[in-house]
Amino acid sequence: ESKAKFVHIKFHDNEILNFGNIKIKAMHTPGHTPDSYCFVMEDRIFTGDTLLINATGRTDFQNGSASAQYDSLFNKLLKLPGFMRIYPGHDYNQKQYSTIDDEKKNNPRLQVKSRQEYVEMMGNLNLSFPKNMHFAVPANL
């Protein structure tokens, strides 16, 4: 499915990846990019740029989609057990991790009532273009 040329291992939504005795479930969570994935391991999830601590990944470049991210967040991640720890790819806000319940309660981007409200909110963020994106974007596509 991925158009990335450097992918060494291709996997699919809900596929179990085995690393010795460690099992990690791949969860396709498009939105930040079409190929965004989160990885579930026991009581934790590595959320990359999909769900951050008190924020969500931006969707305004790299073929992102706020509508797809809404589905990834509200129909997948937020349905996980509340105690599950989340470890984002960056923007930790000086915390080592958060939990699904903490994000439901405290994340301002998760307080919306509908897909339309989320899409409008994400479209109105007016974020500045990140530094070094001319290097990072090609590496992520």
Regions found by a protein language model. Give the residues of each.
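Catalytic core of the metallo-beta-lactamase
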Residues: 5-88
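Accessory terminal helices/loops
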Residues: 71-141
